[in-house]
Amino acid sequence: MATDVFSSKNLAVQAQKKILGKMASSKYIATSLIDDTSGEVLDELYQLTREYTQSKKESEKVIKNLIKTVIKLAVLYRNNQFNEEEIALMEKFKRKVHQLAMTVVSFYQVEYTFDRNVLSKLLNECRELLHQVIQRHLTAKSHGRVNNVFDHFSNCEFLAALYNPFGPFKQHLQRLCEGVNKMLDEDNI
């Protein structure tokens, strides 16, 4: 995003992205920027990821990358940094995330409907749309963060373990779906 023209607004947006990206590393600051329901869902995703990976470091990295990405996306959106094409892609991304959330909850609520390939495909469609939205705004490092998050959550083995009705993650899935359902009810997703 290098240009020869100085722009205070662009400089301010870059500073916001940088500061909020650093702040997202602190759980206290991140929770102050995220509503209670979203925080509960993120906490559940962290616990689930930690138990699945058996790695505190890896699970913290995935959730931190998710939070940083969401915050940077919000900064760009609130500062009107997207052109018309990107706004259209952002709307498409929001609809796809909403569809994903409804599918996650539906697969939990209706027995024997879970299909890991469907969820993985939806997650990867979200990833591609997000990459298109942020293409000209965020660095390769930020794109790597997006891939880290989606690589983890779209992994078919992870999804199969999560939805296994006899597996160790049943309670996590229940709490996760309750939170996602609440976010859907509140129009937060």
From Swiss-Prot:
Family: Belongs to the TNFAIP8 family.
GO terms assigned for molecular function: cysteine-type endopeptidase inhibitor activity involved in apoptotic process
GO cellular component, one term: cytoplasm
Keyword Heme: no
Domain of life: Eukaryota
Known role: Acts as a negative mediator of apoptosis.
Key word Membrane present: no
UniProt organism field: Xenopus tropicalis
InterPro entries referenced in this protein's UniProt entry, alphabetically: TNFAIP8-like, TNFAIP8_sf
PANTHER family in the record: TUMOR NECROSIS FACTOR ALPHA-INDUCED PROTEIN 8 (PTHR12757:SF3), TUMOR NECROSIS FACTOR INDUCED PROTEIN (PTHR12757)
Record's keyword terms, sorted: Apoptosis, Cytoplasm
Record's protein name: Tumor necrosis factor alpha-induced protein 8
GO biological process, one term: apoptotic process
Subcellular location(s) of the protein: Cytoplasm
